[in-house]
Amino acid sequence: MTERKKAWQARLTRCACAAALALGAAAAHADQFGVQLGAGVADHDVKKLDLGLVWDPGLQWWHIAGFHFTVVGEFHAAYWKLDELAASQPNIWEFGVTPVFRFIKDSGWIRPFIEAGVGIRVLTHVELTPDRTMSTAFQFADMVGIGAQFGEHQNYQAGFRFQHISNADIKTPNPGLNFSQIYVQYNF
């Protein structure tokens, strides 16, 4: 790995740690933050571990039949492990942000929801194998999912997501990746 890439990765890691510390400190003063841990798999033997910091500004609109719409902001740092033998770079990091729109039940011990969002991502490496490249470090991440928020104080959340990551044909080739993910979240 070149010194330039190592320096770039070190800067990204420091930025992710600084963001995590800043959000962690803010969470000590508000009940609108959460920590999310997810795991997923994609085609071509790609596995993913994802750490997310979630901010809920408390916005609600369109109350319909005991449900309402809301939006949360998610900040992600993820690690990809490529198990394919021909992997050019078996370890890839992904950093990004996504606004997530939810349609969630208004009240109850268990509050089911559906969600969708489109965000941006930056990858540390774009070449997955010699014949498959993401072409650009800048990617879009769109996802849809289902889940539930639960607990006496709504501190817990679990869900399943389908996530597609690609560069939207900014540059070709653009094979994209489709992840199936499960996640758990603790809300402060």
Task: Pin down the residues of each PLM region.
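Short loop/turn motifs that connect adjacent beta-strands in outer-membrane beta-barrel proteins
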Residues: 27-31, 58-69, 104-112, 152-155
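Outer-membrane beta-barrel "beta-signal"
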Residues: 49-53, 176-188
